[in-house]
Amino acid sequence: MYIRILKLEETAGDSVFLWGARQTGKSTLLETLFPSVRRYDLLKSEEFERFFRNPALLREELENINPSNLVIIDEIQKIPQLLDEVHWLMSNRNIRFVLCGSSARKLIRCSANLLGGRALRSIMYPLVSAEIPNFDLNKAIHNGMLPRHYMVQNPQRRLQAYIGDYLNEEIRAEALSRNLLSFTRFMEIAAQCNGEMIVYKNIAQDCGVSANTVKEYFLILEQTMIGYLIPGFTATAKRKAISAPKFYYFDVGIVNYLLKRSNMAQGTETFGHAFEHLLIQEIIAYIGYNYSDEKLTYWRTSSGYEVSCIIGNGRIAIEFKSCDEVKSRHTKGLKAFQEEYPQARLIVVSMDKYKRVMSDVEIFPAMEFLSELWDRKII
């Protein structure tokens, strides 16, 4: 059993949109936190059908409920019209809702009622290291951090089913059936570009579609919680920085499956990419769970200097190296960034055995970095 970091009970008195990709553990968390509340699960066909036919049923069933009671609606994006009824019940009966979903895209596209700011927004991420007793870094790098994938020895069949279900659901939702092959190809190309700067034109050529279509495909991945676009950090004066975003899938296991990566040995390029992805994944979750206003960006100059992770307005710069001994050549990007931001905290996360400091750069073993991250000592 994993003890999740997200604490929805701290939002008592407010309604909440709880978003998160499929199988991140949203439903399990809600069952654990609120075992006895009224719950509507729109994944159940009979529940979906009756509310789809008549959304007003929700108001009729809840109009006289005790306002102190919480109501959960799972997969709210399946019937956007229900949000009008939710809005009325919140405004006129002071009922508190948790509205759970795996995709905000349908709601955005149909201009659904997003409750006018009356509901807080929370995101459920895959598991993080602080939630797992006896966390195994190598296992996480290979399996990913979705609960059903991390716990098994070989998650390949579960990953295959996950990607298949996602494609079927999103292709159907987006009416992309005639473009199934191009979208599937796009997901594979996006995996090859994972952690790299996006060049839409090049990806479009590889997929056989237009650059605008590729931008729309990336938007689908973002709005269905399957990926993140991380912008470039450009607030530097001495060196020209690139603004094009990088893309990361929301979980390293997805990339491993799409690229057929397995049994990655430490010291190899593939292990290094997966190592960086997992750590970026943890930082994204940390920022999200702490509702931080600080943005995550990366820095790359036209001359080739790069830092994988910039926190805030240049306050912290973090690089990831999967080697077992960081040397000065591994810190060139950080030292170049220091010329722009002399007060920046400089960090390299690696497979070093012990924490140390080398010319103003803190070298963290990965496990120690993760421990200090979740102890609020990094960001």
What is each stretch, according to the model?
Residues K353-I379:
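Domain-level recognition of nuclease-like catalytic cores that cleave nucleotide substrates
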Residues Y40-L70:
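Short glycine-rich substrate-engagement loop in P-loop NTPases that contacts/grips substrate
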Residues R157-R315:
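Accessory nucleic acid-recognition modules appended to NTPase machines
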Residues L18:
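Hydrophobic anchor at the beta1->P-loop junction of P-loop NTPases
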Residues M1-E10:
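Pre-Walker A adenine-sensing motif
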Residues I72, R96-S102:
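Structural recognition of the conserved hydrophobic beta-strand(s) that form the central parallel beta-sheet
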Residues R105-L120, D136:
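Short regulatory helix/loop adjacent to the ATP-binding pocket of P-loop NTPases
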Residues K26-S27:
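Conserved lysine of the Walker
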